[in-house]
């Protein structure tokens, strides 16, 4: 089970809802992924305008936990305002904090992310900050009391996969809250690798919505995350410089 604050989920795949070709493909991809948590940008959806078609009216909201994010925020104050807007619309208190500090790389602003997380915790939100693979920043966020850490594998939408597995493994090793790898995942192999490192979950969007067949890719991501988790729990063999025979030598007949 993936436990985040008071919530428990069977699926370790969290799925973003942007950039799908249409609502039908989006819904089918969500269905086959078996994701229970769906994230969306509050700023890109007019949740108060009933005339505008949006994700909330297309989905069975009782079946999913909707995770609004603060994408578009440039500072802590903007992030807090967006979070409060989501809460006022009737969504749950869980929020993904996203404060971008660089328009080219879309990397998060560490100072504003810390500040926003602290402010939202004081407001009683369940806080999941998107951060870089900075080990020290992850620890400081954890010390604030956030409910999960969401380090990026690589820049948002890049599909580069896990570019710094060493830092990611350090974050996972020191974590006392769930670590959900977020951003940059491009393939099922990337998702499986994140889980093999010990991540508690993976959040992805473009890897599915931008695939040639988003529905098949959603299923592939589901299976790879399950396989990666099983592999982590099973424990891989140690890496060695020299070969070790896979067949036992004891009891073998000697042919002369």
Curated annotation (Swiss-Prot):
Keywords for the protein's UniProt record, in alphabetical order: Cytoplasm, Schiff base, Thiamine biosynthesis, Transferase
EC number(s) stated in the UniProt entry for this protein: 2.8.1.10
CDD domains named among the record's database cross-references: ThiG
Main location: cytoplasm
An annotated Gene Ontology molecular function: thiazole synthase activity
Keyword match Iron: no
Catalytic activity: [ThiS sulfur-carrier protein]-C-terminal-Gly-aminoethanethioate + 2-iminoacetate + 1-deoxy-D-xylulose 5-phosphate = [ThiS sulfur-carrier protein]-C-terminal Gly-Gly + 2-[(2R,5Z)-2-carboxy-4-methylthiazol-5(2H)-ylidene]ethyl phosphate + 2 H2O + H(+)
Catalytic residue positions: 96 (schiff-base intermediate with dxp)
One annotated Gene Ontology cellular component of this protein: cytoplasm
Keyword match Transferase: yes
Cellular localisation: Cytoplasm
Protein's pathway: Cofactor biosynthesis; thiamine diphosphate biosynthesis
Residues bound to 1-deoxy-D-xylulose 5-phosphate: 157, 183-184, 205-206
Record GO biological process: thiamine diphosphate biosynthetic process
Function text: Catalyzes the rearrangement of 1-deoxy-D-xylulose 5-phosphate (DXP) to produce the thiazole phosphate moiety of thiamine. Sulfur is provided by the thiocarboxylate moiety of the carrier protein ThiS. In vitro, sulfur can be provided by H(2)S.
Subunit structure, interactors included: Homotetramer. Forms heterodimers with either ThiH or ThiS.
Family: Belongs to the ThiG family.
Protein name: Thiazole synthase
Gene: thiG
């Amino acid at each position: 089970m993936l436990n985040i604050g008071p919530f428990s989920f069977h699926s370790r795949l969290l799925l973003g809802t942007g950039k799908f070709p249409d609502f039908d493909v989006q819904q089918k991809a969500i269905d086959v992924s078996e994701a229970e948590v769906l994230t969306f940008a509050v700023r890109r959806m007019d949740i108060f305008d009933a005339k505008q078609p949006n994700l909330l009216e297309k989905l069975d909201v009782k079946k999913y936990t909707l995770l609004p994010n603060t994408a578009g925020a440039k500072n802590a104050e903007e992030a807090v305002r967006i979070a409060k807007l989501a809460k006022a619309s009737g969504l749950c208190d869980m929020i993904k904090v996203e404060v971008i500090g660089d328009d080219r790389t879309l990397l998060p602003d560490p100072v504003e992310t810390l500040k926003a997380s602290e402010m939202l915790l004081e407001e009683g939100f369940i806080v999941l900050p998107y951060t870089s693979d900075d080990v020290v920043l992850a620890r400081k966020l954890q010390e604030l009391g956030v409910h999960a850490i969401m380090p990026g594998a690589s820049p948002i939408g890049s599909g580069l996969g896990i570019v710094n597995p060493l830092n990611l493994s350090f974050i996972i090793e020191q974590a006392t809250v769930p670590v959900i790898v977020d951003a940059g995942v491009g393939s099922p192999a990337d998702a499986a690798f994140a889980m093999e490192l010990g991540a508690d979950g993976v959040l992805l969007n473009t890897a599915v919505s931008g695939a040639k067949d988003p529905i098949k890719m959603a299923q592939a991501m589901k299976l790879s995350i399950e396989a990666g988790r099983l592999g982590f729990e099973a424990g891989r063999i140690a890496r060695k410089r020299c070969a070790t025979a896979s067949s036992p030598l004891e009891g073998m007949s000697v042919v002369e």
